[in-house]
């Protein structure tokens, strides 16, 4: 699933969703320009809440009642993990969604299911997942049971539904026989709710007419909301899906139909579509959709049918064409990368109007937010285009790694999502070879997640399976550690093995475990096998020994270099060095570290730092004017610190001839010094000194690292006297960059060609406007005024729209806000709507922001999938932050009920609204908020709340210790 997804990855609307660590370097400068570049973290993966069921759509006709919700651990149905007594082999599922409400105003679906399973251990009960389903009586019971292949089924004594653990329990009068097969039939009805989970409905307007479709989101634990099933990833089976649907609509599922749809004998206006049997697969990868969508399609040379589906108006305007163009090359790339053909005969990808994740890798039928699949050359920015190709690559990577070979349990989710988050850059780079996408993983994944992983409240990539049980616990695993740290350490592993060797090991892993389940050690073993079958690459330790230190303990090291002696030392890096690390590590927070380096521009031999606190090697010893720089291209997941003299020589090199240091490492110098200063390892003035060369810099990555790093200063000081001198300094530094792009674009009439140039143009304009460059304000006013004169013909180049919209709203009043609101309400282009919706949060008028906050409670105004993002946008505004905080406190119960348990984005809301907290009063407020809402709970935001408390304390301390030095530095350097 995409984050970003998931992550995501990734994928993007708001800078604020990246602001997840108190003294991080990844908070984007403003709500505008990061929209064009970063992955939409709030659209990362989710699963549905586990609260009590909604009102039943039908009255049950069952002989037994729902079980009490108190758990007695001696009873197997009170354990969240399924017993190993029964193993499914196949399902036959028929579903009929009703896309008009019933007499009670509810949308419902009816279904029937037959599951075949084998008894592996003698048992007198069947425990199967079921959630919010009402069963129709079959011979006096909720289900019927029969033997297969000559076995006799025991009689059913009673059945019960256990709400807390989401089980249907069938008590039998006699035990099932070991190695015998059985089939269980059921008929049921459920609500086709708009809750974005399980089998749900999505609504949209086409040509002024309301339309309803039925779709699915099963990951992680919501297939059970659609039909009774053994809903764990290791419980693989085949599935025969049949959909009964209105004859004017199209039915889709993981597989192609067996043949044409046929009329439903009971009602001629309905059709029946029966799909081919799936391969052996996990329940969370199932998908089925009923809609009036249209498609564009093509066949690959290997005869795989590719189809892109979306609303008819979007397809008629060609918005699916870019996705179709890149899907074939990406599938071809991964087939060769994995040395394994694409496992299915078709690849459907569909853009949904309502979808809580960024995308979901359902096998053969990938579902997306519209913004992650559709691209309009007339209104979409380069960031929108990058999002489409990277999210497609992420989801198609899963078709092998995740779908063909699947994790045993959710505690190893990091391997599934981290792998896809790494290779998405490789697949997208193949589809767009001129974009240099592989470099952007450093900014989008490595630096983003370091901000979280440097907290004492972080967690290891891999946890014991026993620590991940409930749906809420599973949901918490879908975080930036799993996605971005997973990607970062796998990239590091691929780098020191070499990509070719890494690919050989992965191919062997996929060939061995096709249609099976694995744990992360299985991958290590196959990489070790690949290593052992060649002699060119030698490691001083096994893959297992190296990598376990990176995945079984949280955090990462800072490597400190003393260039006078050549000594290297390592230490667990914490943004707050006084924070209390309560999680023990059997490796004592020491790592085996791959070290690459250059000395005065010349690359040196590779070096392995053992898991010792201190070592010495002359590679890192300098004399005279020599300087040394570690972690080339930031392939290693660690920070680097140097003695003061070496830092000074690096800064001198940057200010005299910056081209000697690679672009990525110019970004690294800025990023690392700011993180080190945050942790009080180096003076804050050293970090600020690393930005002095920027008046000569025109490359994207160093500027992005600087703006992200300085955005923390903005958060801490935009309510204090420091902000004035800070604005003056940044205005001085960015003016040459603004002038550079003004020149190369012929006064903004042309556009840069490369991806990173376009991103840096966005940086230049956004930063110049934020910090008061007069020509930028004039540019914004002129472009916005031209648009208002003719709203049907927007003259603003898509890359600059977020910046122009936001600044126009900030400079204007009610009239400007209402104009943008009307454009938002009327546009059918999702990427344009996202830009407008974010910009509406830029108002500087309190009453307008409060009105906008109230709109988030009305799904007619703001879609449910966009509520968290909208609240986060408002919170990113220095004026809106306190308003959003008050609103969230007042509406916590409703927000929690709607988003709290299953939404990855919910944690981002807590992070966004608290990221400016830097006073004792705000800390007290946060602690009181926690105390006041213990009964309601915090769901998937629980860990984020603890991190917010930790970050607030760190912010208070940092501001107290650094405010005067920062104020003095900006005053001295802003002239």
UniProtKB/Swiss-Prot annotation:
Q: Annotated Gene Ontology MF terms? A: alanyl aminopeptidase activity; metalloaminopeptidase activity; peptide binding; virus receptor activity; zinc ion binding
Disulfide bridges in this chain? 769-776, 806-842
In which residues is substrate bound?
358-362
Q: What class of enzyme is it?
A: hydrolase
Metalloprotease, as annotated region: 75-975
> What cofactor is needed?
Zn(2+)
Sulfotyrosine is found on 182, 425, 430
Give the span(s) annotated as Cytosolic Ser/Thr-rich junction: 33-74
Keyword annotations for this protein, in alphabetical order, are: Aminopeptidase, Angiogenesis, Cell membrane, Developmental protein, Differentiation, Disulfide bond, Glycoprotein, Host cell receptor for virus entry, Host-virus interaction, Hydrolase, Membrane, Metal-binding, Metalloprotease, Protease, Receptor, Signal-anchor, Sulfation, Transmembrane, Transmembrane helix, Zinc
Q: For this protein, what reaction is catalysed?
A: Release of an N-terminal amino acid, Xaa-|-Yaa- from a peptide, amide or arylamide. Xaa is preferably Ala, but may be most amino acids including Pro (slow action). When a terminal hydrophobic residue is followed by a prolyl residue, the two may be released as an intact Xaa-Pro dipeptide
- The EC designation for this entry is 3.4.11.2
Q: Which GO terms describe its biological process?
A: angiogenesis; cell differentiation; peptide catabolic process; proteolysis
Which residue stretches does the UniProt record annotate as biased composition, category Low complexity?
43-59
Q: Which InterPro entries match?
A: Aminopeptidase_N-like_N, Aminopeptidase_N-like_N_sf, ERAP1-like_C_dom, M1_APN-typ, Peptidase_M1, Peptidase_M1_aminopeptidases, Peptidase_M1_dom, Peptidase_M4/M1_CTD_sf
> Residues in the active site?
395
CDD domains assigned: M1_APN-Q_like (cd09601)
**TM region(s), chain numbering:** 12-32
Q: Where is this site: Transition state stabilizer?
A: 483
Q: Which Gene3D superfamilies match?
A: 1.25.50.20, 2.60.40.1910, Neutral Protease Domain 2, tricorn interacting facor f3 domain
Positions contributing to Zn(2+) binding: 394, 398, 417
What post-translational events are described? Answer: Sulfated.
Domain comment, in the record's words?
Amino acids 1-191 are essential to mediate susceptibility to infection with CCV (in canine/human chimeric studies).
Q: Which family does it belong to?
A: Belongs to the peptidase M1 family.
**Quaternary structure?**
(Microbial infection) Interacts with CCoV spike glycoprotein.
Function recorded in the entry? Broad specificity aminopeptidase which plays a role in the final digestion of peptides generated from hydrolysis of proteins by gastric and pancreatic proteases. Also involved in the processing of various peptides including peptide hormones, such as angiotensin III and IV, neuropeptides, and chemokines. May also be involved the cleavage of peptides bound to major histocompatibility complex class II molecules of antigen presenting cells. May have a role in angiogenesis and promote cholesterol crystallization. (Microbial infection) Probable receptor for canine coronavirus (CCoV).
What is this protein's record name? Aminopeptidase N
Q: What organism is recorded for this protein? A: Canis lupus familiaris (Dog)
The gene name reads ANPEP
């Amino acid at each position: 699933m995409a984050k970003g997804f998931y992550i995501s990855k990734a994928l993007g609307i708001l800078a604020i969703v990246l602001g997840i660590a108190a003294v991080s370097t990844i908070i984007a400068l403003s709500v505008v320009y990061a929209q064009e570049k970063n992955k939409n973290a709030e659209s990362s993966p989710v699963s549905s809440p586990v609260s009590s069921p909604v009102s039943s759509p039908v009255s049950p006709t069952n002989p037994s009642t729902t079980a009490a919700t108190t758990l007695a651990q001696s009873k197997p149905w009170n354990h969240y993990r399924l017993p190993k007594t029964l193993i499914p082999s196949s399902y036959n599922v028929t579903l009929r969604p009703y896309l008009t409400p019933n007499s009670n105003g509810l949308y419902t679906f009816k279904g029937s299911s037959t599951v075949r399973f084998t008894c592996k251990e003698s048992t007198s009960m069947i425990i199967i997942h079921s959630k919010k389903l009402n069963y129709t009586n079959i011979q006096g019971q909720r289900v019927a049971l029969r033997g297969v292949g000559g076995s006799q089924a025991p009689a059913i004594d009673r059945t019960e539904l256990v709400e807390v653990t989401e089980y249907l329990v069938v008590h039998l009068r006699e035990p099932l026989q070991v190695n015998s097969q059985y089939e269980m039939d059921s008929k049921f009805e459920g609500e086709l709710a708009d809750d974005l989970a399980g089998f749900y409905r999505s609504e949209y307007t086409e040509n002024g007419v309301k339309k309803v479709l039925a779709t699915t989101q099963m990951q992680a634990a919501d297939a059970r909301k659609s039909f009774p099933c053994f809903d764990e990833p290791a419980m693989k089976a085949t599935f025969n899906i049949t959909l009964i649907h209105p004859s004017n609509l199209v039915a889709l599922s993981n597989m192609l139909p067996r043949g044409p749809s046929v009329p439903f004998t009971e009602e001629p206006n309905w059709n029946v579509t029966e799909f081919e049997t799936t391969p052996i697969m996990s329940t969370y990868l199932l998908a089925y959709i009923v809609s009036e969508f249209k498609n564009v399609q093509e066949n690959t040379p290997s005869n795989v049918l590719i189809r892109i589906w979306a609303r008819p108006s979007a397809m008629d305007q060609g918005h699916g064409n870019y996705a179709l163009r890149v899907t074939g090359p990406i599938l071809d790339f991964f087939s060769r990368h994995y040395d394994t053909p694409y496992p299915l005969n078709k690849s459907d990808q569909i853009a949904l109007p309502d979808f809580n994740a960024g995308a979901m890798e359902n096998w053969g039928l990938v579902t997306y937010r519209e913004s992650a699949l559709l691209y309009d050359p007339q209104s979409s920015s380069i960031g929108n285009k990058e999002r489409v190709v990277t999210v497609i690559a992420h989801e198609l990577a899963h078709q092998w790694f995740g779908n063909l070979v699947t994790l045993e349990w959710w505690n190893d989710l990091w391997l599934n999502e981290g792998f896809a988050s790494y290779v998405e850059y490789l697949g997208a780079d193949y589809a767009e070879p001129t974009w240099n996408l592989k470099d952007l993983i450093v900014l989008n994944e490595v630096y983003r997640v370091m901000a979280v992983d440097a907290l004492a409240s972080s967690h290891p990539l891999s946890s014991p399976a026993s620590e991940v049980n409930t749906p809420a616990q599973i949901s918490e695993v879908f975080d930036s550690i799993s996605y971005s740290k997973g990607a970062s350490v796998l990239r590091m592993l691929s780098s020191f093995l070499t990509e070719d060797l890494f690919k050989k090991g992965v191919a062997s892993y996929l060939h061995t475990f096709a249609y099976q389940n694995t744990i992360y050690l299985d991958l290590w073993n196959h990489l070790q096998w690949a290593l052992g079958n060649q002699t060119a690459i030698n490691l001083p330790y096994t893959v297992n020994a190296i990598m376990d230190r990176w995945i079984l303990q949280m955090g990462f090291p800072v490597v400190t270099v003393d260039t006078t002696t050549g000594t290297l030392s390592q230490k667990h890096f914490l943004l707050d060095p006084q924070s209390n690390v309560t999680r023990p590590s059997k490796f004592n927070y020491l790592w085996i570290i791959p070290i690459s380096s250059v000395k005065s521009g010349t690359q040196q031999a590779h070096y392995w730092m053992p898991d010792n606190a201190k070592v010495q090697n002359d590679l890192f010893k300098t004399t005279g004017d020599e300087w040394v720089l570690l972690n080339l291209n930031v392939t290693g997941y660690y920070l680097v610190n140097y003695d003061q003299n070496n830092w000074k020589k690096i800064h001198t090199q940057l200010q005299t001839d910056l081209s000697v240091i690679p672009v990525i490492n110019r970004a690294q110098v800025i990023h690392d010094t700011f993180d080190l200063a945050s942790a009080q390892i180096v003076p804050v003035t050293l970090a600020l000194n690393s930005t002095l060369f920027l008046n000569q810099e025109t490359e994207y990555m160093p500027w992005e690292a600087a703006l992200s790093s300085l955005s923390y200063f903005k958060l801490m000081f935009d309510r204090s006297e420091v902000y004035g001198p800070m604005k003056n300094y940044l205005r001085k530094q960015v003016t040459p960059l603004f002038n550079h792009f003004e020149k190369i674009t012929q006064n903004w009439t042309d556009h840069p060609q490369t991806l990173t140039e376009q991103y840096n143009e966005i940086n230049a304009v956004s930063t110049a406007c934020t910090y008061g460059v007069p020509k930028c304000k004039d540019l914004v006013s002129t472009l916005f005024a031209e648009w208002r004169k003719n709203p049907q013909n927007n003259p603003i180049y898509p890359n600059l729209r977020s910046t122009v919209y936001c600044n126009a709203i900030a400079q204007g009043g009610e009239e400007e806000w209402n104009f943008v609101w009307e454009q938002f309400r009327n546009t059918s282009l999702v990427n344009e709507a996202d830009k407008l919706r974010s910009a509406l949060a830029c108002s500087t008028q309190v009453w307008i922001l409060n009105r906008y906050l109230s709109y988030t409670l009305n799904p007619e105004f703001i879609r449910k999938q966009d509520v968290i993002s909208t609240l986060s946008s408002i919170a990113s505004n220095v004026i809106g932050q306190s308003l959003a905080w008050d609103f969230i406190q007042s509406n916590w119960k409703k927000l929690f009920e709607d988003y709290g348990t299953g939404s990855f984005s919910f944690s981002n809301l807590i992070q966004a609204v608290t990221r400016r907290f830097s006073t004792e009063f705000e800390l007290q407020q946060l602690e009181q908020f926690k105390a006041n809402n213990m009964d309601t709970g915090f769901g998937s935001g629980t860990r984020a709340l603890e991190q917010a408390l930790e970050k607030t304390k760190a912010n208070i301390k940092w501001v107290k210790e650094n405010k005067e030095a920062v104020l003095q530095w900006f005053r001295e350097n802003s002239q």
